[in-house]
Amino acid sequence: ICSSDVILFYFLFYDPETQPDRQRQQADRVDLVDAAIDGKLERIDAHWDPRPSVGVVMASAPYPETPVTGDVIYGLDTVPADAKVFHAGTALDAHGQVIATGGRVLCACALGDSVADAQQRAYAGVAAIHWTHEFHRSDIGWRAIALERAAG
């Protein structure tokens, strides 16, 4: 970037927008960041899994207002193996139980042979997890699935 303007690059690996892609990225993320810092990114094989990935955020109600915190989260150990759960708003309580600490708490992600398949697998991960004030959207991926179906 050759300019007198200052640009802020704000990128967080824990943002829900990045988590489905984190499943697809096969290269070591530390190596990628180090290479980017050193200006040698072209030397890294940033292999991507070509399959689609879908991520469903699980939040604490009444997100985005002040969410309820402290609910014990159940079912993390029963999530299907083909789904991955990213933690964002969790902690361990005094008894070692995973609790919701507010806002966007978890993101259940999955890869699939199609967007519809990835969506089904991600929602299977969501279905395994529960806590008292949990909520999630049930329409994640619908636009991409409609495009996929229209394409044949």
Task: Label every PLM stretch briefly.
Residues 12-82, 93:
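Active-site "cap" helix and flanking loop/linker of ATP-utilizing ligase/carboxylase catalytic domains
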Residues 37-39, 85-91, 116, 138-141:
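Short C-terminal domain-edge/linker segments immediately following a structured domain
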Residues 1-6:
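Short, small-residue-biased leader/transition segments that mark boundaries at the very start
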Residues 57-59, 88, 111:
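Generic beta-strand/beta-sheet core signal
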Residues 71-89, 108, 116, 122:
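RNase H-like, Mg2+-dependent phosphodiesterase core
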Residues 7, 18-20, 52-54, 83, ...:
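Structural beta-strand/beta-sheet cores of well-ordered domains, especially the beta-sheet scaffolds
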Residues 94, 100-152:
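Generic C-terminus detector
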